[in-house]
UniProtKB/Swiss-Prot annotation:
Modified residues (Leucine amide): 13
Keyword annotations: Amidation, Neuropeptide, Secreted
Record carries keyword RNA-binding: no
Family: Belongs to the pyrokinin family.
Taxonomic source organism: Locusta migratoria (Migratory locust)
Keyword Secreted tagged: yes
Gene Ontology biological process terms from the UniProt entry: neuropeptide signaling pathway
Gene Ontology molecular-function annotations: neuropeptide hormone activity
Entry's localization field: Secreted
Official protein name in the record: Locustamyotropin-4
Length: 13
């Protein structure tokens, strides 16, 4: 499922 970044993971950089 896509997150806020639109990726299959949540890159919280």
């Amino acid at each position: 499922r896509l997150h806020q970044n639109g990726m299959p993971f949540s890159p919280r950089l």
